[in-house]
């Protein structure tokens, strides 16, 4: 059987070549070297201002509206991680006193009420949506006088997307505010107009944290009421973290370059820069998560290469061999594979060897978990290959069951936990139990990916996606399938919100990973498949890694 695969490779086999665009970055990030003096300078300046910003935060606790405003500023500017314990304590106090506070302050404006609602919900505290009832008239419509309150409308719009099932007032608010903001945007100052348009394109709750922070710093800089100390602190910290990210990007770029898979497996996508953006968005921006970011980036690029092998190059016979070899997960199985697959197989085993060598004592079970998730991935990828080979169109739910694995969601979670020192078997068991936020983050990613990529995949020849499966099962045109999948996506996001606001037996860091997974899926696939057509991410890459802020 192995001999057949090798002989086939020497023949002119008809392969499903995708002809993916080449990397737009090459090895440009691999040569970066972090200068200790530069990072030390930024760190010193950040530490000098940190105490003053903390004083500002603590002083704001005298009044709830001022307190929530400062907390929101710290979050939007991307510096709240410096004060996590203080912010958590303050939010607990605000949440506990909120009913009486709102009852005693019926005059509160829409902006403030919506801000309290959003910030508390985004930090896992479920404020009831009836706080917005007072902004409706006797006919159940939103009052006309709020249509001229641009700041309040924007605040309500941002709050409306943190909704759960059964909250009709928030569903109505989303439509109402979006309609009015699209008209009002042209009537405000240019810098506020851009802020509104950014929000309409991507509400903060849906966005990539670091990119949202960069956009907000530019907006805040034009705010006449800005605090210069806070602005400078945010800029310095952004530049400091940017240097750290560039160093991490250089590390994974050199790792990928040394594997030399781009030359040996020219059919596959070289997207090491883009997958690091993914890792940064999913894992989080804090410096202490560097190991997880590096591992998620490495596993994402490796999984992408495996995916391209199954979807866009390998014959069904070769794919069966590769899947069988991976069940053994041993170098002894390498000789059963065609030559090109040997390079990939060896690279994966080497990655696992690295993680085992770097693992803390007594945590080898994390690497075992990652290996098992990789085996699951190859089985699921092969299943799609078998479907394609036999011209079988699975039922919609049958497809989604298998596709929940091919999203690579749990494999990348394993990589995240590998790098998270405090993670233990408790976190792995929680993920394997598949709580609602885990299931729906993967579902959200799969469906967005399919809608963005299915037409081009079908042209070159690929397994039916959720779109084709839905069309086939229900006998509907593509447009109707899109419409129904869009409804599923909306439901999925509400499920994510709902579960996010529940108490879980794992840390908030782990729960955050899954809401970030959904956010990054939205970031990559909302307009087009930005992994494949990476020019769509070029501006964002430059903003995040190449353009420091003037201080």
From Swiss-Prot:
Recorded GO MF terms: magnesium ion binding; terpene synthase activity
Cofactor: Mg(2+)
Protein EC: 4.2.3.-
GO biological process terms, semicolon-separated: diterpenoid biosynthetic process; hydrocarbon biosynthetic process
Major enzyme class: lyase
Residues given in the record as Mg(2+) 2 binding sites: 307, 311
InterPro entries in alphabetical order: Isoprenoid_synthase_dom_sf, Terpene_cyclase-like_1_C, Terpene_cyclase_plant_C1, Terpene_synth_N, Terpene_synth_N_sf, Terpene_synthase-like, Terpene_synthase_metal-bd, Terpenoid_cyclase/PrenylTrfase
PANTHER family per the UniProt record, alphabetical: OS04G0344100 PROTEIN-RELATED, TERPENE SYNTHASE 6-RELATED
Family: Belongs to the terpene synthase family.
Protein name: Probable terpene synthase 8
Organism, scientific name: Ricinus communis (Castor bean)
Gene behind this protein: TPS8
């Amino acid at each position: 059987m192995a001999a057949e695969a090798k002989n086939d490779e020497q023949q002119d086999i008809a392969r499903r070549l995708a002809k993916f665009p080449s990397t737009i970055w090459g090895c440009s990030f691999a040569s970066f070297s972090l200068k200790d003096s530069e990072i030390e300078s930024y760190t010193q300046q950040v530490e000098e201002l940190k105490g003053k910003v903390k004083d500002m935060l603590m002083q704001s606790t005298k009044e709830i509206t001022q307190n929530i405003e400062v907390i929101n500023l710290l979050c939007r500017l991307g510096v709240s991680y410096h004060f996590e314990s203080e912010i958590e304590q303050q939010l607990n106090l605000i949440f506990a006193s909120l009913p009486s506070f709102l009852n005693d302050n019926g005059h509160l404006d829409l902006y403030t009420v919506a801000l309290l609602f959003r910030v508390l919900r985004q930090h896992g505290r479920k404020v009831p949506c009836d706080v917005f009832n007072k902004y409706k008239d006797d006919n159940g419509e939103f009052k006309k006088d709020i249509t001229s309150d641009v700041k309040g409308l924007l605040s309500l719009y941002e709050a409306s997307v943190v909704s759960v099932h059964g909250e009709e007032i928030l569903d109505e608010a989303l439509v109402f505010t979006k309609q009015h903001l699209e008209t009002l945007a042209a009537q405000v100052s240019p810098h506020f107009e851009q802020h509104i348009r950014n929000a309409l394109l991507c509400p903060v709750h849906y966005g990539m944290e670091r990119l949202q922070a960069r956009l907000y710093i530019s907006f805040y800089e034009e705010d006449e009421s800005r605090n210069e100390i806070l602005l400078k602190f945010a800029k310095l910290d952004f530049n400091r973290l940017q240097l750290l990210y560039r160093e991490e990007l250089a590390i994974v770029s050199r790792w990928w370059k040394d594997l030399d898979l781009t030359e040996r497996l020219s059919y596959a996508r070289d997207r090491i820069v883009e997958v690091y953006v993914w890792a940064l968005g999913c894992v989080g921006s804090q410096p202490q998560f560097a190991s997880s970011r590096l591992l998620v980036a490495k596993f994402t690029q490796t999984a992408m290469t495996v995916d391209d092998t199954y979807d866009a190059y390998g014959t069904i016979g070769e794919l069966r061999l590769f899947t069988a070899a991976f069940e053994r997960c041993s170098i002894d199985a390498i000789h059963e594979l065609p030559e090109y697959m040997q390079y990939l197989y060896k690279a994966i085993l080497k990655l696992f060897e690295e993680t085992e060598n770097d693992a803390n004592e007594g945590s080898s079970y994390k690497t075992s978990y990652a290996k098992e998730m990789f085996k699951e991935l190859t089985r699921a990828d092969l299943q799609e290959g078998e479907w394609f080979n036999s011209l079988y169109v699975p039922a919609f739910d049958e497809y989604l069951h298998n596709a929940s694995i091919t999203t690579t969601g749990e494999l990348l979670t394993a990589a995240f936990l590998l790098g998270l020192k405090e993670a233990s078997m408790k976190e792995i068991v929680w993920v394997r139990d598949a709580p609602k936020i885990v299931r729906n983050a993967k579902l959200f990613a799969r469906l967005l990916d399919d809608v963005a990529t299915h037409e081009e995949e079908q042209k070159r020849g690929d397994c039916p996606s959720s779109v084709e499966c839905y069309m086939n099962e229900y006998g509907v045109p593509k447009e109707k399938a899109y419409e129904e999948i869009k409804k599923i996506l909306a439901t999925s996001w509400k499920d994510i919100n709902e579960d996010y606001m529940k108490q879980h037996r794992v840390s908030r860091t782990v729960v955050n990973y899954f809401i970030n997974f959904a956010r990054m899926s939205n970031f990559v696939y909302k307009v087009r498949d930005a992994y494949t057509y990476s020019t769509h991410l070029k501006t964002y890459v430059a903003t995040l890694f190449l353009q420091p802020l003037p201080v």
